[in-house]
Amino acid sequence: ESQCPGCKQMITTSFADAMKADGFLDMAELNFWPYGNAHESQTSSGWSFSCQHGTAECQYNYLETCAKNLVQCPVQYFNFLNCVEKLDSTTNYEGVANKCATQAQITNLADIMSCYKGTDAEALEHEVALKTEALSPPHQWVPWVTVDDVYDENVQDEMGDSLLNYVCNNYTGANKSKDCPPSGTVFAQASKDVCIKRDPTAFLQ
């Protein structure tokens, strides 16, 4: 979810560092699902969402989901996502989208904004909700990172410290990045901030 501090931290530090490594995406494929602990309800016209950190989080979830659907280059999409996560304390959604699209060299911002401002955003977010709710076991907090559809809290902690190191240590193919850390490299432990799914203080507008 776009405004969970733990999600922000993992994306803008460990994941961003990994994406800078030459050939990282030859070793791993990343998928992001901007939903988290949100709730959805069906309306006469489609779907309505309430988000753990309020209306702004829902708006940024829509923006990130529309970009995910329309930006074909995974590097550009990640750079857009990383930028949004750093700037989403403001409610100037369009301003953030413009700045981040420029930074990520995305040329179809008009399509993204058309999606974001229309009913496509809610329809796509519903698909993300279905993907999230289909997790087995169900997620209990976010970030909730799976590897090949399997969740392991210890693995998530490793990826929070260094996604690049985790992938390099577990990759068995022929395209290992030259930027993989040397064996035995020790990484500082990242904060383990999470946003609990059933937090009773959530959804206060």
Please report, for each region that a protein language model flagged, where it lies by residue.
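N-terminal start-of-chain detector that recognizes signal peptides
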Residues: 1-5, 115-118
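Structural alpha/beta surface segment adjacent to cysteine/selenocysteine redox centers
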Residues: 2-104, 181-196
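C-terminal cap of thioredoxin/glutaredoxin-like
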Residues: 19, 88-205
